[in-house]
C-alpha cells in the first residue's frame, strides 16, 4: 500500500510518524496532507536505509542535490563520495543523474547507503540501452522503470508532459529545449511520428509506482533555458498537461510532485509558483533554481539561489540545487558543498520569511553568540562550521583569539559590538545580556530539523568513502 493509499484510508504509517517528529507537527496533519496530495513522502518499500522525510508547502523547505557520473567521469567511488558530501552538507534528497558506465552499480550503491530519498531519470538508462533515442521502445521504457523501482528508487522524473502538439511551440525560442529528458523525447517524437511514450503509457507507469510506492516527479521537459523563454506557450502548455497527469496519478493512489523552471526573471518567479499550484491542484512544486539572470556562468549557484529563495517564499516545496559548475562541467565534491550551502541558505531564508514556526531560532542563537564574542559557539552554529572556522583562523589562528572581542575585519579599535557593549556598561543605555544562560535554547526549538543545526541531519558515516572496497568499473557492461 502506498503512503497516499494509507493516508486516504485514515492510517498513520511509521513513515508519517517519523516525518511528524522531524517537522515538529501532529502526525494527523501529515496524514491529511499526504491524503490530499499536498505533500509527498518519497519512500520506496525497498529502500531499507531510508530515514523518511516530507515535501510540501506546509512543511520546511527542502533541498535536493544532483549527483551522478558522465561518459567522461565514470567512477563509483567518486559518486559515493559525492553522496557522502551531499548528505553531510544537508541534502534532503539526492538525484542520481548518471549517464556514464555502471549505471546499475552506482544506483544500487546510492540506494543501499543513502539515508535520504534517491531520485532518478529513467529515460537516461533507456537511451544507454537503446543506443539512440529514436530506438527506445515502449517495452524498454517500462522495463527500465520497473527495474529501478525494484532497486529501491524513491522518486523518478518522468517527462510525460512533453506532447507532440507542444513541440512547434518551441520554434521561436532562443535556447530551444534545454531539458535532457525533454530533448530526448522530442527527438523520439519527431523521428517516430508518434506521441510521447511516457504519456501514452502513463497509467502503466502508475501501476508500477503503486506496487513499489515510487513518487512521481513530473518533469518539465519544456522548461525555459533562458530568461527570454520564460513563461512562453510551450512551458505553460506542458504545465497544463502535468496538471492532468497529477490527477491521473492520484486516482492510482500514487504520490506526485511537479518540477519547475529553470531560468525566470525575478519579477515572474512568484507568479509561476502560484500558477503551478493552481494548475496542479496544490501538488508540491520542485524547482530548479530558478536562475534570475543568464550572465554569470561559474556563479550560477548564486544566480539560482536568489530565485530559489523567492520561489520558496512563494510556496515551492523543494529546491533543486545548482552548483558553480552549472552550464560548464560536471560537479565535483567541492561544487556539491558550495551548491548545497547556497541552497540551504535559500531554503532557510524562505522559511524565515514565511514565518515557519521556530525557523528564526537558529538565527537568533547565532546572533546572540556573535554579540557575546563566543567564537566557538558561532562556529558550531554556522551553516558550514568548517568554512566559518577556516575563514576566521586565516588571520587570527591562535586559541587566544577565540576569546577576543574582535576579529580581523575591524580590529580592536573599530569593533562596533565591543564599542556598543562598552558604551552600555559605562553610560545610560540598557545593557544587553550576552551570557550563555540567556540565549535562545535551540534544543527546545519548535523548528523543523532542517531549520536547526547541524545542517547535515545525517552524519553519513555508513556511506563508503573513496577508499572503500567497491566494484571495479567494468568495460562492456549492459549500461555501456
From Swiss-Prot:
Pfam families: ThiC_Rad_SAM. Zn(2+) binds at residues 263, 327. One of its GO terms (biological process) is thiamine biosynthetic process. This is Phosphomethylpyrimidine synthase. The keyword Hydrolase does not apply. Pathway: Cofactor biosynthesis; thiamine diphosphate biosynthesis. It catalyses: 5-amino-1-(5-phospho-beta-D-ribosyl)imidazole + S-adenosyl-L-methionine = 4-amino-2-methyl-5-(phosphooxymethyl)pyrimidine + CO + 5'-deoxyadenosine + formate + L-methionine + 3 H(+). [4Fe-4S] cluster binds at residues 407, 410, 415. It comes from the Archaea. Substrate binds at residues 66, 95, 124, 159, 179-181, 220-223, 259, 286. Binds 1 [4Fe-4S] cluster per subunit. The cluster is coordinated with 3 cysteines and an exchangeable S-adenosyl-L-methionine. Residues 426-480 are annotated as: Disordered. InterPro entries: ThiC (IPR037509), ThiC/Bza_core_dom (IPR038521), ThiC/BzaA/B (IPR002817). The gene is thiC. It is an enzyme of class 4 (lyase). Transmembrane segments: none annotated. Belongs to the ThiC family. Its EC number is 4.1.99.17. Keywords: 4Fe-4S, Iron, Iron-sulfur, Lyase, Metal-binding, S-adenosyl-L-methionine, Thiamine biosynthesis, Zinc. Residues 470-480 have a biased composition (Acidic residues). Its cofactor is [4Fe-4S] cluster. Catalyzes the synthesis of the hydroxymethylpyrimidine phosphate (HMP-P) moiety of thiamine from aminoimidazole ribotide (AIR) in a radical S-adenosyl-L-methionine (SAM)-dependent reaction. It comes from Haloarcula marismortui (strain ATCC 43049 / DSM 3752 / JCM 8966 / VKM B-1809) (Halobacterium marismortui). GO terms for molecular function: 4 iron, 4 sulfur cluster binding; carbon-carbon lyase activity; zinc ion binding.
Amino acid at each position: 500500500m502506498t503512503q497516499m493509499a494509507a493516508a486516504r484510508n485514515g492510517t498513520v504509517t511509521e513513515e508519517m510518524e517519523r516525518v511528524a517528529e522531524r517537522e515538529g507537527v501532529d502526525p494527523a496533519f501529515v496524514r491529511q496532507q499526504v491524503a490530499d496530495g499536498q505533500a509527498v513522502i518519497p519512500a520506496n518499500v525497498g529502500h531499507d536505509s531510508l530515514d523518511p522525510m516530507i515535501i510540501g508547502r506546509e512543511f520546511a523547505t527542502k533541498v535536493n542535490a544532483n549527483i551522478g557520473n558522465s561518459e567522461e567521469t565514470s567512477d563509483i567511488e567518486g559518486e559515493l563520495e559525492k553522496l557522502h558530501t551531499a548528505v553531510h552538507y544537508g541534502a534532503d534528497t539526492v538525484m542520481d543523474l548518471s549517464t556514464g558506465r555502471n549505471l546499475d552499480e552506482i544506483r544500487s550503491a546510492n540506494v543501499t547507503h543513502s539515508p535520504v530519498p534517491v531520485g532518478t531519470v529513467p529515460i537516461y538508462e533507456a537511451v544507454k540501452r537503446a543506443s539512440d533515442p529514436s530506438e527506445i521502445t515502449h517495452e524498454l521504457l517500462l522495463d527500465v522503470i520497473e527495474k529501478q523501482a525494484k532497486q529501491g528508487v524513491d522518486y523518478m522524473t518522468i517527462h510525460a508532459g512533453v506532447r507532440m502538439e507542444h513541440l512547434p511551440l518551441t520554434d521561436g525560442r532562443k535556447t530551444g529545449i534545454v531539458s535532457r529528458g525533454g530533448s530526448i523525447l522530442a527527438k523520439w517524437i519527431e523521428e517516430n511520428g508518434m506521441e510521447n511514450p511516457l504519456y501514452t503509457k502513463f497509467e502503466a507507469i502508475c501501476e508500477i509506482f503503486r506496487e513499489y510506492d515510487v513518487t512521481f516527479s513530473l518533469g518539465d521537459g519544456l522548461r525555459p533555458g533562458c530568461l527570454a523563454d520564460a513563461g512562453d506557450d510551450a512551458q505553460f502548455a506542458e504545465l497544463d498537461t502535468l496538471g492532468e497527469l497529477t490527477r491521473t496519478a492520484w486516482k492510482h493512489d500514487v504520490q506526485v510532485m511537479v518540477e519547475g523552471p529553470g531560468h525566470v526573471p525575478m519579477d515572474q518567479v512568484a507568479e509561476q509558483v502560484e500558477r503551478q499550484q493552481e494548475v496542479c491542484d496544490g501538488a508540491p512544486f520542485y524547482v530548479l533554481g530558478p536562475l534570475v539572470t543568464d550572465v554569470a556562468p561559474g556563479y550560477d549557484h548564486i544566480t539560482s539561489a536568489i530565485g530559489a529563495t523567492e520561489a520558496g517564499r512563494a510556496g515551492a516545496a523543494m529546491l533543486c540545487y545548482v552548483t558553480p559548475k552549472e552550464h560548464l562541467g560536471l560537479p565535483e565534491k567541492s561544487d556539491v558543498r558550495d551548491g548545497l550551502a547556497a541552497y540551504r541558505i535559500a531554503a532557510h531564508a524562505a522559511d524565515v520569511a514565511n514565518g515557519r514556526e521556530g525557523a528564526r531560532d537558529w538565527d537568533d542563537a547565532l546572533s546572540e553568540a556573535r554579540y557575546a564574542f563566543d567564537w566557538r559557539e558561532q562556529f558550531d552554529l554556522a551553516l558550514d562550521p568548517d568554512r566559518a572556522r577556516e575563514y576566521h583562523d586565516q588571520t587570527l589562528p591562535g586559541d587566544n583569539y577565540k576569546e577576543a572581542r574582535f576579529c580581523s575585519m575591524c580590529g580592536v579599535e573599530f569593533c562596533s559590538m565591543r564599542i556598543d557593549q562598552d558604551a552600555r556598561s559605562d553610560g545610560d543605555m540598557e545593557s544587553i545580556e550576552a551570557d550563555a544562560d540567556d540565549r535562545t535554547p535551540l534544543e527546545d526549538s519548535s523548528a523543523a530539523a532542517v531549520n536547526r543545526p547541524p545542517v547535515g541531519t545525517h552524519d553519513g558515516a555508513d556511506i563508503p568513502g573513496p577508499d572503500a572496497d567497491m566494484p571495479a568499473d567494468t568495460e562492456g557492461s549492459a549500461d555501456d
